[in-house]
């Protein structure tokens, strides 16, 4: 998994799979879901991230037991 925040575009992208994107769907305004040819979720993009996420430049990562 890879998380990227682009200050220039104010977008936060979370990539779950390293696959070619076949289709994108704007689930809600400013929330874009990308899928591969098999319908698997590849990535999630949040537009205007600084207004939607408290601190887009910081990430906390946890693994549940």
What feature does the model see in each segment?
Residues 1-65:
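Small, basic N-terminal interaction modules of short regulatory proteins
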């Amino acid at each position: 998994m890879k998380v990227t925040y682009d200050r220039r575009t104010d977008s936060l992208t979370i990539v779950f799979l390293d696959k070619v994107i076949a289709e994108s769907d704007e689930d809600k305004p400013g929330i874009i879901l990308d899928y591969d040819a098999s319908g698997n979720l590849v990535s999630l993009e949040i537009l205007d991230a600084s207004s939607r996420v408290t601190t887009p430049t910081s990430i906390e990562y946890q693994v549940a037991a």
